[in-house]
């Protein structure tokens, strides 16, 4: 099977449509369909900050749950939105406010539909996907070699948030270790979470979050070709979001 793995979309529907068209997908049915039966996979964070988060929920639900033609690994923003929809006490900030504003603008019956779709999508999706006979792993923030096959709380924190140190940068964002430098596994790890100006290949890992919602690009990785394809963002560029990885 051949896959097109998509980086963090964050509600940037137009960029997602542009990217999938560039990857050869046809939208005549209202959903991206590839003539050669390639499958889409998402590294998570499909919502928040961008203008069309609910549209992305509907599309990914259709592809993953209804048609079973794509793969979705949830990200930290997905986890927070899930907890919001469950009625948990979460802080509506750091991007969640844009999704909540879209949601609250809907009539109540449509709110219920979108909420149930996202809860189903989240609950029926694994923490990460092991694809192509264990040759490639799709996850949100990465995964250590010794964590592959595990799904306990420690692994969940790593996969959703990265290798965090517990310290904070001046802007409040977490300091993360560069786990990819230590990765020695044979399987490719394809992930996002931390915006980079260009797709970042380190050992058998590749970060494809090129900051679409911060004015960078939306990137897809063609697997097994290991070719990256990007489209420019329509949003303003926010330089401080592209911090060097140390």
From Swiss-Prot:
Q: Which GO terms describe its cellular component?
A: cytoplasm
Query: Pfam families of this UniProt entry?
Result: Metallophos
Report the EC number(s), separated by commas if there are several: 3.6.1.17
Q: Keywords on this record?
A: GTP-binding, Hydrolase, Nickel, Nucleotide-binding
Which cysteine pairs are joined by S-S bonds? Answer: none
Q: Which InterPro entries match?
A: Ap4A_hydrolase, Bis(5'-nucleosyl)-tetraP_PrpE, Calcineurin-like_PHP_ApaH, Metallo-depent_PP-like, MPP_PrpE-like
Q: Which family does it belong to?
A: Belongs to the PrpE family.
What this protein is reported to do is described as: Asymmetrically hydrolyzes Ap4p to yield AMP and ATP.
Q: What is this protein called?
A: Bis(5'-nucleosyl)-tetraphosphatase PrpE [asymmetrical]
